[in-house]
Amino acid sequence: MLPEADDSKSAAHPTRKALLDVAIEVFLADGFKAARVADIAQQAGVRLSAINYHFGSKEGLYLALLQHHADLAWRTAPPPVLDPDTPLQQRLQALIAALVRRMLDPDSPSRIGRLMIREVVNPTAALDVMFERFTLPQVNLLLGLLREFFGPQVPREVLLRAALSIVGQCLVYGVASPIITRLQADFDLRGAALDRLAQHIATFSWAGLQALAAQQEGQHA
């Protein structure tokens, strides 16, 4: 989904890795605009010129960070590969489980969920790139299953609303976690709790899809 890293300047290079490790904390805390590359370089224990050498600019560092964490997310929670004969409900459940893990798992090495939430709230030039390389492939997988569920006659607008309703259930736990923890003091997203959340979203979504399908049939009866 994302381009392969240049081996000569990969995330494994000690200086590059040090910069990425510090940059994730700075960009998440301060946002892209307020983040200072001088602070990142100082905290990483490298010269400021190292950012230009490895990334070209502040913008290049930020985009590389997004791509690095998106790649980590794909590797740790890849899209499920299921036989087409597997019942559609099970395939949707597997897709939602992977999406939830990719975006919300606090134990994942990827921080792409929080990065993308920040990017959506305060867009930069990186948004178009990340939309094409990270967001759109996931949406297209979901739309493919929804098209299979609804059939060819249902307008794309209906599919998009259904897809956004499913994705929105996942994202709200990342965006509104300070509110959720006040509503539920023992709220947790680790291990089995994350699995239960994914199952809930899948069950809720499947019921909603069935209601939408009945509505569509009624409109065309």
Regions found by a protein language model. Give the residues of each.
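Short secondary-structure transition hinges
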Residues: 73-84, 103-140, 187-195
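Short hydrophobic clusters on alpha-helical segments that form packing/core surfaces
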Residues: 19-27, 166, 205
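Hydrophobic alpha-helical connector segments
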Residues: 78-112, 159-166
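N-terminal hydrophobic signal/anchor transmembrane helix of membrane proteins
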Residues: 89-105, 109, 195-216
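N-terminal intrinsically disordered/low-complexity leader segments
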Residues: 1-14, 214-221
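Hydrophobic/aromatic-rich alpha-helical bundle segments in the mid-to-C-terminal region
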Residues: 111-113, 127-136, 145-202, 212-221
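Helix-turn-helix
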Residues: 18, 26-60, 64, 68
